[in-house]
Amino acid sequence: CINLREVKLPKSLYTICEETFYGCESLESITLPDVVNIGESAFAHCISLKNIVIPESVEFGIDDSAFLNCTSLQKVTVNGNIQQIGSAVFMNCENLKSINIPKSVESIGNDVFEFCDNVTIKCYENSYAHEYAKTNGINYSLIFDEREFGDINNDGKVDVNDVTHLQRY
């Protein structure tokens, strides 16, 4: 698939299997449907791929080496309920600058960001991704949950209970 530049996959697709787009050197853009898993090396060596959005439907995870050596990849947005990011998923994505990782991630494999010297992980405080970034010396930026200004008791609304709670202090 040397000349493949763009792919729009059908909504009926359930999973992206192992090595599906392996080595598609000209692939710049892909729209992922509501798949539940991205297989091992599914996009490995897609050296022209610049951005990827992992849909909310991906629950199980991103398997090992899924985006290995995608050297033009700059930004990854991971949405939803993903549970695991396999080993070496973004290894040698040397231009990767930003990836957001949701709270739902419970496991991140070895060498995921090896040779990604400029990456910043956007993560939630005290999440698995936050601890992973700190432990592995990876730059990170914290994402804060949106709260309404004045919501002292964090129940999602501003009311008299917030005033009562504030008066205690």
Outline where the language-model segments fall:
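Consensus positions within tandem repeat domains that build extended binding/scaffold surfaces
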Residues: 17-22, 39-42, 63-66, 86-89, ...
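Alpha-helical segments with a strong preference for the paired helices of cellulosomal dockerin domains
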Residues: 152-169
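Short, aromatic/basic amphipathic alpha-helical patches
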Residues: 128-137
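Low-complexity, Pro/Thr/Ser/Gly/Ala-rich linker/spacer regions in secreted
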Residues: 137-151
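Structural signature of tandem-repeat unit edges
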Residues: 1-15, 25-37, 47-61, 70-84, ...
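Phosphate-coordinating loops and pocket residues in cytosolic domains that bind phosphorylated ligands
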Residues: 54, 135, 168
